[in-house]
Regions:
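Universal eukaryotic N-terminal targeting presequences
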Residues: 1-2, 16
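A short, charged/proline- and glycine-enriched loop
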Residues: 61-65
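Alpha/beta enzyme core
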Residues: 15, 19-37, 41-46, 50-57, ...
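Intrinsically disordered, low-complexity regulatory segments in eukaryotic proteins
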Residues: 2-11
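Conserved alpha/beta catalytic core and glycan-binding cleft of carbohydrate-active enzymes
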Residues: 326-417
Length: 427
């Protein structure tokens, strides 16, 4: 049942919006506006819808949700099989190694905007295949592969219309939640690089509104996350919004941008302005600090009690250098107590892929095939903890397609897995 999509009249849709799920969410448009934009085809985006509903429930029943960034479909399967309950899809990782241009980019908003939806589609299909294989094998230790996907919408890749279309593409691919940030799309860069340029507060609210409208038109209760980069930004594109003017220094750049006094106060002001338009808020930090996190959380929740918060456990931080062991051990728990219900290590996929491959390659260069044999021994040990990638043929579904072929040919066929080296040597 999808009440958002099943509403036939503006009155019915307005009643849905008055349910507890939408408490604290402000829409600047009407239900009639949404119905006018829907057309007559009722398409239920099941993966995104059920993922959003599941993620929403998790946010309200867990101390916090911790996950990492997946760079491939196989990465996503590993996250789930290891016990994580959600999948994060990072724009940085898409730019670096999985975008549709085929190039390696830094996180400067250079890659095609449909790249992240494409990766989400690959991830949902990989998770579905893992579920199909599990179902076929009738495993006793059932794994729920249907993990909500939280995706990076960057700065929207343009204006409100671009954000509207991007949000639609994310939903169509299967995203449960999408975050957008208040940087200028044309100057957009990684949150931990310098010379960041913000858009006016009102302009970003329009981006959030565009994303909400897209979700409403598609009839999906998507979770929208509003991120502010105000702590580390240097410039503002325009002084059009009076709320921003107290942070201007009076200095202009050659491009016409306004230099600003950024910091936690500006981040709080922007978070408060964005709160009615998003389910969750995220302030991008320059270092991991429980004190700074508490300052932001207290200010937001003083006006918006219970507002959901997100925290980037960024690989751009030198965690061992900045925090002692005791602080690290309690970091997630204390963030959760402050209201940071979604915590994520954005670039985990990139770093594990590169570090593990370098380590293996270095050992192979020095030891030959003996190094790979040692690596296999590690995989065998990981199997005891639930790792399934060691038997790679079975992992990708050879047995599944054997079953497909036998079904087509009435059981009279030669199967691929039966006579494989994997079946004879790895069982």
């Amino acid at each position: 049942m999808n009440p958002l999509l099943e509403a036939q009249t503006a009155e019915e849709l307005e009643r849905v919006w008055k349910s507890p799920r939408w408490n604290g969410i402000l829409r600047t448009y009407t239900a009639e506006d949404v119905l006018k934009l829907r057309g007559t085809w009722k398409i239920d985006y099941t993966i995104a819808r059920l993922g959003s509903e599941k993620f929403w429930k998790m946010l309200h029943t867990s101390d916090y949700i911790l996950t990492a960034g997946a760079l491939t479909g196989s990465h996503a399967i590993q996250l789930v099989e290891a016990g994580l309950k959600a999948i994060y899809v990072s724009g940085w990782q898409v730019a670096a190694d999985n975008n549709l241009s085929g190039n390696m980019y830094p996180d400067l908003g250079l890659y095609p905007s449909n790249s992240t939806p494409h990766l989400i589609m690959k991830i949902t299909r990989a998770l579905q295949r893992a579920d199909q294989i599990q179902h076929l094998e009738k495993r006793n230790n059932h794994i729920d592969y249907f993990a909500p996907i939280i995706a990076d919408g960057e700065a929207g890749f343009g204006g409100p219309l671009h954000a509207f279309e991007l949000m639609k593409a994310m939903i169509e691919a299967g995203a449960a939640a999408v975050h957008f940030e208040d940087q200028s799309p044309s100057e957009r860069r990684c949150g931990h690089l310098g010379s960041k340029v913000l858009v006016p507060t009102k302009r970003f609210i329009n981006i959030l509104t565009a994303a909400r409208l897209a979700a409403d038109v598609l009839g999906v209760p998507s979770i929208i996350i509003a991120r502010t980069d105000a702590i580390g930004a240097q410039y503002l594109t325009s002084d059009a919004d009076p709320r921003d003017r107290k942070y201007l220094t009076g200095v202009r750049t050659q491009e016409g941008y306004h230099a600003i006094r950024s910091g936690i106060e500006m981040a709080i002001d922007r978070g408060l302005a964005y709160a009615p338009y998003a389910e969750m808020l995220w302030f991008e930090t320059s270092q991991p600090s429980l004190e700074e996190a508490k300052q932001f959380a207290d200010a937001i929740r003083r006006k918006y009690p219970g507002k959901l918060l997100a925290y980037n456990l960024s690989p751009s931080f030198n965690w061992v250098k900045l925090l002692d062991g005791e602080t690290l051990a309690e970091f997630n728990k204390k963030l959760g107590q402050m209201g940071y219900k979604f915590q994520f290590i954005t670039l985990a996929g990139f770093h594990t892929l590169n570090a593990s491959m370098f380590e293996l390659a270095k050992n192979i260069a020095e030891q030959g095939v003996e190094a790979y044999a040692s690596f296999q021994s590690k995989e065998i040990e990981l199997e005891k903890k639930g790792f399934r990638g060691f038997k790679h043929q079975r992992f990708v579904g050879v047995n599944y397609y054997d079953e497909v072929l036998m079904t087509i040919e009435g059981g009279e066929t030669i199967t691929a897995l039966t006579n494989s080296t994997e079946n004879s040597q790895f069982v």
